[in-house]
Amino acid sequence: AHFRYDAMFPASALDLGADVVIQSVHKTLPSLTQTALLHIKCNRPDEGCYADRERIDRYIHMVQSSSPSYVLMASIENSIYQMEQTDMAPYGKQLHKLRRRLGQMRHLRLADTGLIGQAGIRDLDISKIVVSTRGTCLYPAEDGLTGFTGAQLDDILRREYHLEMEMCGADYVTAITTVMDSGEGLERLGDALTRIDSQLTDAGYKPDGRSGNQKSVYSMRCDTAMS
């Protein structure tokens, strides 16, 4: 939903030729939860697309409520108005600063534009902060060497830094940033991730099991790579 508001974002699906697009405006625009927009490129197939507006309207009428929330609809309109009035430059500057900082992490890895062209990746939304834990290891003394998972990173960020991620997977976490995020909030995210990364790096783990100046249970054995 935010792509059209600045050139730093990828082209929107509509700009790339999609006939029907659903945008969850509550994700990245200042709109209430549950709000979304349905975009239809044209009214009939003979107008140059595969969408049939009459059929779509018929199916919507089968499932939609007869008592829509005017609060939610007003929220959508207000969010669009706000975005039209917002200068994206300060947010873009803060976002690029955060990404440069996270790009310097030694073991946690930020998904960046270097991935474009690989494995079918055509573009990248820089407002999504995707951090990979692949290749990092924990060394809790009671459990031995274990892989550091996305779920563990997500838990640490929530429990120790009071930062809620959008989602996590087996070996990554995803944070969503928006124009409504403050510079202070983005800096807090950068502080948390770089600190966790430094704990993985500076643990002083030794292969014989004797840890020298171990600083954290999230310690990484730097001579081990997880595939």
Positions of PLM-derived features:
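Non-catalytic terminal extensions of PLP-dependent enzymes
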Residues: R99-S227
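Conserved PLP-enzyme active-site core in the AAT-like
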Residues: A1-L115
